[in-house]
Amino acid sequence: MENLNALILGIIEGLTEFLPVSSTGHMILGTTILGIDIDEFWKSFLIIIQLGSILAVIFVFWRKLFQGLDIWLKLAAGFFPTGVIGLFVAKYLNALFNGWVVVGMLIFGGVVFILIELAHKNKQYRINSLEEISFKQAFCIGIFQSLAMIPGTSRSGASIIGGLLLGFNRKVAAEFSFLLAIPTMIIATAYSIYKEPELLSNANSLIPLGIGFITAFVVAVLVIKFFLKFISKFDFIPFGIYRIILGFVFFYLYYSGILNAGSEFKL
């Protein structure tokens, strides 16, 4: 992989991993436009840049993470349903690895965001801090997060929608979604390596790996901070609109044959 491509993919990962817009969809687009072969090194590269994004969350929220055991117990409660559901359905997920599924989930998720915001326009939120989240609510967020196993859904999008429906204010919904990414992404990465241990041996080009990792980390830190400030003042409707537009872009690319809805989606 060329260093410039590693930089661009690191930027894409950092920009989209924690925004409710589907990082998978953007990775498909970026990889295709750059003409990158989806080989074993690419899979290893993807794992490394995702680790950069995870480190970004830890960097931004380290104070909250070390305030006490309570937040970790809530994250455990949130991860539990995702982990259990993942173990049971993982072997069936390949059937969903299709570009048309991405199109449908991008558009559907965008519509849901818009409808939720319109329904909650003047509603008072019940949960205004991480400390107010109950273990039951954290568990429910984990159930919503498990929907992100469907390609194009967006892990952060699914968990944020769950938070909004449970009465979290926008910032708390986003913060808990970001924090829940830590155990979710670390364990998902470990599971991928367990299934394919050769992924580590394929990670032998240190310069592009380092560029991708550092870029994803720096961009993700900036995006997380910007996003939290943005949603403190505005709603999620712009992200809903963006998802719908992106969904129709993919629809055109697949329908016109520019992208292959089957093979090119299999990341």
Swiss-Prot record:
- Role played: Catalyzes the dephosphorylation of undecaprenyl diphosphate (UPP). Confers resistance to bacitracin.
Q: Which organism is it from?
A: Campylobacter jejuni subsp. jejuni serotype O:6 (strain 81116 / NCTC 11828)
- Source organism's superkingdom? Bacteria
One further remark on this entry is:
Bacitracin is thought to be involved in the inhibition of peptidoglycan synthesis by sequestering undecaprenyl diphosphate, thereby reducing the pool of lipid carrier available.
Q: Per UniProt, what is one GO molecular function of this protein?
A: undecaprenyl-diphosphatase activity
Pfam families recorded for this chain? BacA
Q: Which family does it belong to?
A: Belongs to the UppP family.
- InterPro entries attached to this UniProt entry: UppP (IPR003824)
Q: What is this protein called?
A: Undecaprenyl-diphosphatase
| Reactions listed under catalytic activity | di-trans,octa-cis-undecaprenyl diphosphate + H2O = di-trans,octa-cis-undecaprenyl phosphate + phosphate + H(+)
Q: Which residues cross the membrane?
A: 7-29, 41-61, 69-89, 96-116, 173-193, 207-227, 239-259
What are the EC numbers?
3.6.1.27
Which keywords are on file for this protein?
Antibiotic resistance, Cell inner membrane, Cell membrane, Cell shape, Cell wall biogenesis/degradation, Hydrolase, Membrane, Peptidoglycan synthesis, Transmembrane, Transmembrane helix
- Its membrane topology: Multi-pass membrane protein
Cell compartments where the protein resides: Cell inner membrane
- Cellular component GO terms, alphabetically? plasma membrane
Enumerate the Gene Ontology biological process terms.
cell wall organization; peptidoglycan biosynthetic process; regulation of cell shape; response to antibiotic
Q: What class of enzyme is it?
A: hydrolase
